Amino acid sequence: MNTATLSLAEQIHRRLAEKLHTTLLEVIDESHLHAGHAGASPTGLGSHLRVKIASPLFTTVSRVQRHRLVYDSVQDFIDQGLHALAIEVI
């Protein structure tokens, strides 16, 4: 499937699954909850995401390093306008 047809949440899901070998992964678009706030997308989609994630790569690293791994995996999306990414490591 062409990534141009995927939502931002779907693209990030695909990226995190590929890069971090996830065993559990949910990417939830919460942009609609932030309508009218600074950084909110005018379309109401893709500016605020929540990630619930588990990966075997997280077992030997600190909480800060886990978050760094996630942020490093999606940095290009942040550079393109993703405003907020909440991370919940399971």
Which residues make up each language-model segment?
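Contiguous, often N-terminal, cationic amphipathic patches that form binding interfaces
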Residues: N2-V64, Y71-D72, D79-I90
